[in-house]
């Protein structure tokens, strides 16, 4: 029984140290992200097409911020009225080998000027590829909530 408890403790410790998440946000100099209220999703995503489900989950996380999702037609109308609109370029990469790792990068551009406004990145490493993705997604979600 004591041996089982020791193995369980060791297994729990191994899981704890084997799961790791990081995230960061970088902003263009002089840009006030608070003035942006809207976001337009387009076809700006790169990476493995097998990861489109993760890209969709990232879009859902962006939708869960204070940003309102609109169409490009509506964006043009709002811009003409002095509103500011963002458009994200989403990149997801999952390493299936070498211990695995998932990286999510969102590059937010001003929809009107195409100026890079902010880059938000996260990464996750866990026990499986799916676990890596969930860790990276949770990390990017938290950073998005902080920024928007």
Positions of predicted regions on the chain:
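Generic recognition of short, well-ordered alpha-helical segments
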Residues: 53, 57, 101-103, 135
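A structural "domain/chain start" motif
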Residues: 8-11, 16-67
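Surface-exposed short loop/turn segments
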Residues: 64-65, 70-131
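C-terminal/domain-edge helix-coil "capping" segments
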Residues: 21-33, 61-64, 115-148
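Bacterial N-terminal signal peptides that target proteins for export
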Residues: 1-8
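Alpha-helical context
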Residues: 30, 34, 38, 43-45, ...
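Charged, low-complexity, helix/coiled-coil-prone segments
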Residues: 43-50, 76-90, 135-140
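Mid-sequence acidic-hydrophobic segments that form the walls
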Residues: 7, 109, 147
């Amino acid at each position: 029984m004591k041996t089982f408890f020791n193995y369980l403790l060791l297994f729990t410790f191994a899981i704890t140290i084997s799961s790791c998440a990081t995230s960061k946000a970088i902003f263009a100099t002089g840009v006030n992200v608070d003035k942006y209220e809207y976001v337009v999703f387009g076809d700006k995503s790169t990476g493995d097409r097998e990861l489109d489900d993760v890209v969709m989950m990232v879009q859902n996380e962006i939708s869960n911020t204070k940003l309102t999702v609109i169409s490009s037609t509506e964006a043009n109308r709002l811009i003409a009225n002095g509103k500011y609109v963002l458009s994200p370029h989403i990149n997801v990469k999952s390493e299936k080998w070498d211990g695995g790792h998932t990286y999510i990068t969102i590059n937010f551009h001003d929809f009107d000027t195409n100026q890079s406004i902010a880059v938000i990145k996260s990464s996750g490493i866990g026990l499986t590829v799916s676990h890596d993705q969930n860790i990276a997604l949770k990390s990017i979600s938290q950073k998005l909530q902080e920024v928007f």
